[in-house]
């Protein structure tokens, strides 16, 4: 009589993996319904239906651990259970990283924190799976089985998981984002495919969903991308460059301040394992070209010659759906190349007759004249810090990372996403407007104090009736308090921020203090 090779529990764990998959699909449905029924950016008086990140992670951890130990009688049964649960998390992990998100009114970056923590949870569960199986083999005096092909493949998969976690930590990701992205992308495909040959019983149904999500993302990029040639590049100063593309690459209308993603042409094999670069469109739909205002970085866009080909896809909206329909008073903070986001916003507000004001922070005055003529009658305060970020002195702002066009995403560690430069940009300060900055130079600090409270009466140096220059740095809280004296009807009052993290954070704090709505540039990819 033949003895069953795996015992009665060989297929018992399949249902637990299926249960995690069903829960994952329900979570996706919840996010979709939530974003359809609740604005992405709300007035403070409206109820927030979002679960805090820590609570979501805690619930997932409790769910996975609970299912890993329930009705378990043998060590190897627990080992198998945790292995299947680890792989069952992959469909949701992959889905949360798809860009652009297929969910309605969903910014891809808003899903990345949960993606990151579920990935860490999956790695932890994978470690438990490996440790339990190792203990089982040792107890049975069968350690040699670790080196069987299908079992040793599991050891390699676990090692790849650990590499993905280590390279995703801030100290690595911030400094070598391109390498992190390549490792992450190739490792995800390896884990998804290799587990097919490692897992017993098979994981075909789970792999179907992983392959569907990853494959559809690739297919979208192929279908949505177009190969275009640069019309011109022009230096606006040492830190800013203007790049133009033919107007025909975008539809007749797009929402102002939308962004596109740029990469090497798809004919280049490296483009498939490299991250794309998001750039905000600084021109308006009515202009006869597509303009980007960028910083010179390792990605060759700023220095590319006319006629150089790139792959472009988009545009993707960055502003909330109801911004232009609800706004009646808007304060915009921009840092450096963040003007690429602010410029089309204030131009559109001016045409619509909506009250607005711009605060732009720069290291030096180079390139300002290129923008002044397009500001029209927009009330503008321009702050010149006068310091080089690399000197480590004075009031500084972080040189914007490659590909972000000087704009940031969110404050939930999202400043680390989409940042492509691999060395000096990642080491710079991003605390431009920190209230407790202790390293400000005397001149800059004096300039800041001299201008404090004078934003409404021409400041330190008046350039025109609408543009005022200041030395030093602004105080967003004071500027916002003075601009939003009337605190009634907060639904129509907005603060927008685009620039280094310090600027975004202090602008958001000012919005909370004054009770108005807040939005910062977030790539909906």
Swiss-Prot record:
Q: Which residues form the FAD-binding FR-type domain?
A: 215-344
* BP GO annotations: reductive iron assimilation
Q: Membrane-spanning regions, if any? A: 13-33, 52-72, 82-102, 118-138, 152-172, 179-199, 203-223
Q: Which CDD domains match?
A: NOX_Duox_like_FAD_NADP
UniProt xrefs under Pfam families: FAD_binding_8, Ferric_reduct, NAD_binding_6
Give the membrane topology. Multi-pass membrane protein
For this chain, the family text in UniProt reads:
Belongs to the ferric reductase (FRE) family. AIM14 subfamily.
Q: What is the protein name for this chain?
A: Probable metalloreductase AIM14
Origin species, per record, is: Yarrowia lipolytica (strain CLIB 122 / E 150) (Yeast)
Gene designation: AIM14
């Amino acid at each position: 009589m033949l003895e069953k090779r795996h015992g009665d529990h060989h297929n018992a764990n399949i249902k637990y993996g299926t249960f995690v998959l069903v829960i994952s699909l329900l979570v996706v449905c919840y996010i979709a319904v939530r974003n359809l029924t609740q604005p992405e950016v709300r007035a403070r008086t409206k109820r927030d239906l979002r679960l805090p990140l820590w609570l979501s992670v805690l619930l997932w951890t409790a769910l996975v651990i609970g299912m890993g130990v329930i009705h378990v009688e043998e060590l190897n049964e627990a080992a198998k259970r945790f292995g299947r649960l680890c792989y069952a998390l992959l469909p949701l992990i992959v889905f949360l990283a798809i860009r652009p998100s297929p969910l309605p009114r969903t910014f891809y970056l808003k899903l990345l924190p949960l993606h990151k923590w579920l990935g860490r949870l999956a790695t932890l569960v994978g470690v438990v799976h490996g440790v339990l199986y190792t203990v089982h083999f040792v107890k049975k005096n069968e350690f040699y089985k670790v080196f069987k092909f299908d079992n040793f493949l599991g050891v390699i998969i676990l090692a790849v998981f650990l590499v993905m976690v280590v390279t995703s930590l801030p100290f690595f990701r911030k400094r070598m984002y391109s390498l992190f992205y390549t490792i992450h992308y190739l490792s995800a495909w390896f884990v998804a495919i290799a587990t097919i040959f490692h897992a017993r019983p098979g994981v075909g149904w789970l792999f179907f969903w992983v392959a569907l999500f990853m494959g559809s993302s690739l297919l979208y990029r192929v279908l949505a991308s177009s190969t275009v040639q640069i019309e011109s590049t022009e230096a606006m100063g040492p830190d800013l460059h203007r790049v133009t593309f033919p107007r025909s690459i975008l539809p007749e209308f797009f929402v102002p301040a939308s962004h596109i993603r740029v990469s090497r042409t798809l004919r280049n094999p490296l483009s498939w394992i490299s991250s794309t670069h998001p750039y905000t469109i600084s021109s308006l739909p009515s202009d006869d070209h597509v303009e980007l205002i960028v910083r010179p970085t390792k990605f060759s866009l700023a220095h590319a010659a006319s006629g150089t080909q790139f792959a472009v896809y988009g545009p993707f909206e960055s502003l909330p759906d109801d911004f232009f329909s609800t706004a009646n008073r808007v304060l915009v903070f921009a840092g450096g190349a963040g003007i690429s986001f602010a410029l089309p916003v204030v131009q559109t507000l001016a045409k619509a007759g909506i009250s607005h004001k711009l605060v732009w922070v720069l290291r030096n005055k180079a390139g300002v004249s290129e923008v002044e003529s397009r500001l029209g009658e927009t009330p503008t305060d321009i702050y010149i810090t006068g310091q080089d970020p690399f000197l480590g002195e004075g009031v500084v702002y972080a040189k914007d990372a490659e590909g972000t066009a000087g704009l940031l995403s969110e404050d939930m560690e999202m400043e680390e996403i989409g940042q492509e430069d691999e060395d000096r940009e990642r080491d710079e300060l991003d605390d431009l407007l920190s209230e407790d900055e202790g390293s400000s130079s005397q001149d800059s600090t004096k300039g800041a104090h001299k201008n404090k409270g004078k934003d409404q009466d021409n400041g330190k140096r008046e350039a025109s009736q609408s543009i005022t220059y200041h030395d030093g740095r602004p105080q967003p809280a004071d500027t916002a308090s003075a601009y939003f004296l009337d605190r009634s009807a907060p639904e129509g009052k907005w603060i927008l921020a685009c620039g280094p993290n310090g600027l975004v954070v202090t602008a958001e704090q000012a919005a909370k203090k004054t009770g108005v709505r807040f939005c910062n540039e977030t790539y909906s990819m």
